[in-house]
């Protein structure tokens, strides 16, 4: 019985619900409520809800962004990672910024290291679909170590993963300058050029770093190709080769055949959690092309980026903000301007984790969300930042588009010119004034907040199982 109480308390700490709380401000000025104290009746209720939620998820679970990124995937991954043996990244690179908080409210901004790194019992995997900037990865690893989090022995990187070099960043900037007035709005982290090297078959994979001579030859060829293509290209390839000799020694303990590792983990009954980067509406094939990322954040990219078969996935969680945001250029049907946009941006602190750029703000777009669900087949939804909508008199949800020809559609257009001209058809719902940042159970949410979540659930046809009500790890409501 004592053991059971300890398990309940431990699960409750992941999702909140305590007899006492203390509040502090994080380094961005946001209020973070931190749970403390002994298990209470409320905590037990939360713990039991979390146990039921865990039981539904199964051995292989993917957490994917369903909008334009920045939905809060890292927080859910960090929470769920306590129940999983393996936490894996499958695609993207350092253009994907994930912000997570530990039990003390300390913030960690991660770009390449999987969000499950705070779980001491989990092995973090960087899969073959990720493009890896090794100096940047080691910066993150070193910062984590300074904060008392040691990634050594707990993180492996695929020998098939392609390397992203500083020359790719240089190319990214030169390419953006070439586009002039038609800029994509790239993060200039070199992601697109790195994937281009992969596609044109002159990329360098992590496993190549083990052969010093071959690595040098491949990097020289890559630099020569870039110099021939871009007039203003500047890159000291010989200095980079010397630099990577030291990096090669340091990365060696992390290199592994992750395809074999993750499949053996699955076959032995271990639980695997996949952390998606970017989001479906930025998918190279399904997103608002060409205003997209250079990889496939949808479910297909998960399978390709890890070498894990589709039939092995039981749970696919789509993460969506209670409103929407977007960074960079591209069509955005529910975009808001003026006072409402400014208010939501400040309340939600909507600035890019990777770029620091102010995010564009919009109402929740169910046409886009249902499109993402169509592609991924979500089994559950995680609605995040519901607390940001507090204090609003009324809320709007985009439920359809009115096309330039006057017809109304609930399908997401592929044509960008059409998408830029659509008029959004909205439903209006009543808002709520209560502060919900300390709410930890469904029953304690204001009625109008419940109605909002239930309407999203109804429109999506998918259960909104997890509801984020604040930035802290404990600020999560599980819908019974």
Curated annotation (Swiss-Prot):
EC number of this enzyme: 6.3.4.4
Cofactor binding annotation: Binds 1 Mg(2+) ion per subunit.
Catalytic activity from the UniProt record: IMP + L-aspartate + GTP = N(6)-(1,2-dicarboxyethyl)-AMP + GDP + phosphate + 2 H(+)
Active site: 70, 98
Residues that hold substrate according to the record: 353-359
Residue sites binding GTP per the record: 69-75, 97-99, 359, 385-387, 468-470
Coiled-coil positions: none
Presequence range in chain numbering: 1-54
GO process annotations (BP): 'de novo' AMP biosynthetic process; IMP metabolic process
Pathway: Purine metabolism; AMP biosynthesis via de novo pathway; AMP from IMP: step 1/2
GO molecular function: adenylosuccinate synthase activity; GTP binding; magnesium ion binding
InterPro entries according to UniProt: Adenylosuccin_syn_GTP-bd, Adenylosuccin_syn_Lys_AS, Adenylosuccinate_synth_dom1, Adenylosuccinate_synth_dom2, Adenylosuccinate_synth_dom3, Adenylosuccinate_synthetase, P-loop_NTPase
Swiss-Prot/TrEMBL cofactor(s): Mg(2+)
Domain of life: Eukaryota
Keywords: Chloroplast, GTP-binding, Ligase, Magnesium, Metal-binding, Nucleotide-binding, Plastid, Purine biosynthesis, Transit peptide
Annotated Gene Ontology cellular component terms: chloroplast
Family matches, as SMART domains: Adenylsucc_synt
Residues at which IMP binds: 70-73, 95-98, 187, 201, 278, 293, 357
Binding of Mg(2+), residues: 70, 97
Subcellular location: Plastid, Chloroplast
Family (UniProt): Belongs to the adenylosuccinate synthetase family.
Biological role: Plays an important role in the de novo pathway and in the salvage pathway of purine nucleotide biosynthesis. Catalyzes the first committed step in the biosynthesis of AMP from IMP.
Oligomeric form and interacting partners: Homodimer.
Protein name (record): Adenylosuccinate synthetase, chloroplastic
Organism of provenance: Ostreococcus tauri
Highest classification ranks of the organism: Eukaryota, Viridiplantae, Chlorophyta, Mamiellophyceae, Mamiellales
């Amino acid at each position: 019985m004592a053991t059971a109480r300890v398990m309940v308390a431990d699960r409750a700490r992941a999702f909140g619900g305590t007899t006492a709380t203390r509040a502090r401000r994080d380094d961005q000025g946001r209020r973070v409520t931190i749970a403390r104290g002994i298990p209470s009746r409320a905590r037990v209720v939360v713990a039991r809800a979390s146990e039921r939620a865990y039981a539904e998820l199964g051995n292989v679970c993917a957490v994917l962004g369903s909008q334009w990124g920045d939905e809060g995937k890292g927080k859910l991954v960090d929470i769920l990672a306590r129940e999983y043996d393996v936490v894996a990244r499958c695609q993207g690179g350092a253009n994907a910024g994930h912000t997570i908080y530990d039990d003390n409210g300390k913030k960690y901004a991660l770009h390449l290291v999987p969000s499950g790194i705070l779980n001491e019992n989990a092995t973090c995997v960087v899969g073959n679909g990720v493009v890896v900037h090794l100096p940047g990865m080691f910066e993150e690893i070193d910062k984590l170590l300074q904060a008392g989090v040691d990634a050594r022995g707990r993180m492996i990187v695929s020998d098939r993963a392609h390397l992203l070099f500083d020359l790719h960043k240089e190319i990214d900037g030169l390419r953006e300058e070439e586009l002039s007035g038609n800029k994509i709005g790239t993060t200039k982290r070199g992601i697109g050029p790195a994937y281009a090297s992969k596609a044109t078959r002159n990329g360098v994979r992590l496993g190549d770093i083990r052969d010093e001579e071959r690595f040098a030859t491949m990097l020289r060829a890559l630099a020569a190709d870039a110099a021939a293509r871009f007039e203003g290209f500047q890159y000291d390839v010989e200095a980079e080769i010397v630099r990577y000799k030291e990096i090669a020694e340091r990365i060696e303990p992390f290199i592994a055949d992750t395809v074999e590792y993750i499949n053996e983990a699955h076959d032995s009954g271990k639980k695997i959690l996949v952390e998606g980067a970017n989001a479906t509406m930025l998918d190279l094939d399904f997103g608002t092309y060409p205003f997209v990322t250079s990889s496939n954040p949808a479910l297909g990219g998960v399978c390709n980026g890890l070498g894990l078969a589709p039939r092995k996935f039981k749970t696919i969680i789509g993460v969506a903000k209670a409103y929407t945001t977007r960074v960079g250029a591209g069509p955005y049907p529910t975009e808001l301007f003026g006072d409402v946009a400014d208010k939501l941006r400040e309340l939600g602190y909507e600035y890019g984790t990777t770029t620091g750029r102010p995010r564009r703000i919009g109402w929740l777009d169910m046409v886009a969300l249902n499109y993402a669900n169509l592609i991924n087949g979500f089994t559950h939804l995680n609605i995040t930042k519901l607390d940001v909508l507090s204090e609003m008199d009324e809320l709007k949800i985009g439920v359809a588009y009115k096309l330039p020809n006057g017809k109304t559609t609930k399908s997401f257009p592929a044509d960008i010119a059409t998408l830029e001209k659509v008029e959004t058809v909205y439903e209006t719902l009543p808002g709520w004034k209560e502060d919900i940042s300390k709410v930890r159970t469904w029953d304690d949410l204001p009625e109008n907040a419940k109605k909002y979540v239930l309407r999203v659930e109804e429109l999506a046809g998918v259960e909104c199982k997890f509801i984020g009500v604040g930035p802290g790890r404990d600020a999560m409501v599980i819908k019974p």
